[in-house]
From Swiss-Prot:
InterPro entries: Kinase-like_dom_sf, Prot_kinase_dom, Protein_kinase_ATP_BS, Ser/Thr_Kinases-Pseudokinases
Catalysed reactions, as listed in the record: L-seryl-[protein] + ATP = O-phospho-L-seryl-[protein] + ADP + H(+); L-threonyl-[protein] + ATP = O-phospho-L-threonyl-[protein] + ADP + H(+)
Protein source organism: Sibon nebulatus (Cloudy snail-eating snake)
Enzyme Commission no: 2.7.11.1
UniProt name for this protein: Serine/threonine-protein kinase mos
Active-site residues from the entry: 186 (proton acceptor)
GO terms of molecular function: ATP binding; protein serine kinase activity; protein serine/threonine kinase activity
Residues where ATP binds: 53-61, 74
UniProt family annotation: Belongs to the protein kinase superfamily. Ser/Thr protein kinase family.
Gene3D superfamilies: Phosphorylase Kinase, domain 1 (3.30.200.20), Transferase(Phosphotransferase) domain 1 (1.10.510.10)
């Protein structure tokens, strides 16, 4: 099995001020993704949030479907107390969007434009890495498994052989990120799938 780490990266790459986002809106109010992320946009009609997977200081992550595929959707909330930090968190996560490695979660799409019903700084659609985190496995805590009938609890425990596999996969992912001059700033068992 392969371990994926949720992306949280540095150094920060932020677009220049005064540029238009996907050719719409006024230049002073809408930010544009960097040129290397120009493919990023979300077809909102194809996105269906299923249920909350978790939330943290800068946003919430949902299990969802996008164009029929199961994905994880991170909505970065507008943080009134620390707006700069929430913006930096959003842009830092997008730094890994162009990277391709088995142990790094892939970004499917992203946008700073959100439907008016959402109070969000931005949305990132990522590959769905599963229901069970390393935290669940280490501590034998039940994890949520989705099925058509709803949610149920299940658990498994970490063996020595599994610990070695997880460790090797984590090191491989980190070595790749470091080779790209990216540092994971939130590495913990709850962010390892």
């Amino acid at each position: 099995s392969s371990v994926n780490a949720r992306p949280c990266s540095s150094p920060l790459v932020c677009p220049a001020k005064g540029e238009k986002f996907f050719g719409v809106g006024s230049a002073s109010r809408i930010r544009q993704l960097p040129p290397r992320l120009a493919w990023c946009s979300i077809d909102w009609d194809q996105l269906c949030l299923l249920h909350l997977l978790g939330s943290g200081g800068f946003g919430s992550v949902y299990k969802a479907t996008y164009h029929g595929a199961t994905v994880a959707v991170k909505q970065v909330k507008k943080c009134s107390k620390n707006h700069l930090a929430s913006r930096q968190s959003f842009w830092a996560e997008l730094n890994v969007a162009c990277l391709d490695h088995n142990n790094v979660v892939h970004i499917v799409a992203a946008s700073t434009c959100t439907p008016t019903s959402q109070d969000s700084l931005g949305t990132i659609i990522m590959e769905y890495a599963g229901n069970c985190t390393l935290h669940h496995v280490i501590y034998g805590i039940g994890y949520l498994t989705g099925n058509n009938d709803g949610l149920k609890r299940d658990h498994e425990f970490l063996s020595t052989a599994q610990a070695v596999v997880y460790s090797c996969d984590i090191v491989a992912g980190l070595m790749f990120l470091h080779s790209q001059l990216i540092v994971h700033l939130d590495l913990k068992p709850a962010n390892i799938f």
